[in-house]
Structure formats: structure tokens, C-alpha cells
Amino acid sequence: MERVETQPLGYLLHRLTSALRSEVTVTVLTPLGLSFPQYLCMRLLSQSPSMSNAQLARGINVSPQAMNRVVRGLQKRSLVVRAAVVPSGRSQPIELSFEGAELLKRTNSGVRAAERRVLAEFGEQDRRDLLKLLATLGHG
């Protein structure tokens, strides 16, 4: 069996991501009628309001066509809105609605609980250190 220190980082991150995504989807998102891409879209919009479909697609690494389906699903539930007036160009900025922001608040607490379950073998300081390392790597 290969030692953990010699396994490729991408493989280890994929395993962690898969475990976390599964836990979040089953315990938090599915009961609320959300998909993981919808949650990520709402999260991005909460951090950077008025994003275009293309910006959202790049933000969660999906095609613009796939993001359009995600946004339409959120629009049908009144969780996001497209601006009625376009400031410039062709893209209609997308924003989180009040209902979407409220649902995201509820979702975030469940996501945090799912993270704690997935990382249950870590102590609190180890979890904080891991989050700091991942944040640093993600901005590099």
C-alpha cells in the first residue's frame, strides 16, 4: 500500500472533495431541493453580486450552458434574479434574491456541520490549519 505522503496531491484532494460533496449533498442540499452546483452558484453570488452567467460558469468550472441550466433552476424558485436593465453589453447580471440569501444562510450552517463530520478525525486546530492552507493554495 502506498504511503499517504507519496500519493499525488490531486488524488488526495479529489478524495476529500468527493467525501465532502457527498456528505453536503445528502445531508444538507437534497432535503432543501438544491444541487451542489446550485449551492456553489448561490455562494459565489453572495460573495460577488451581479455576476454574469459566464463569470459564474468560470467560478465553478462548468460550461456556460451548464451554468445557464443551474441559473434557470434557481430562477424558477425565485432564489436568483436577472437584472431587468443591462448596464452595458449583452449579459444580464445575476443576483441572489432575498429568498436566496435566506436559504443560503440556512444552507451554510448545514454545510459547516457536514465539514465537521467529514473532518471528524481532526482536532479543531488541525481543521483551522487545513482551511488556512487550502485558502492560501486557492489564491496562489
What do the predicted segments below correspond to?
Residues 53-54, 65, 72, 92:
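Residues within helix-turn-helix
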Residues 31-35, 66-69, 73, 123:
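Short glycine/proline-centered loop/turn elements that form peptide/ligand docking sites
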Residues 17, 43-47, 108, 135:
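Short, locally clustered residues in the helix-turn-helix/winged-helix DNA-binding domain
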Residues 1-2, 125-140:
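C-terminal regulatory/oligomerization modules of transcriptional regulators
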Residues 1-32, 136:
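N-terminal leader segment of winged-helix/HTH proteins
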Residues 22-63:
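N-terminal helix-turn-helix DNA-binding core of bacterial DNA-binding proteins
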Residues 72-132:
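Charged, amphipathic alpha-helical coiled-coil/dimerization segments
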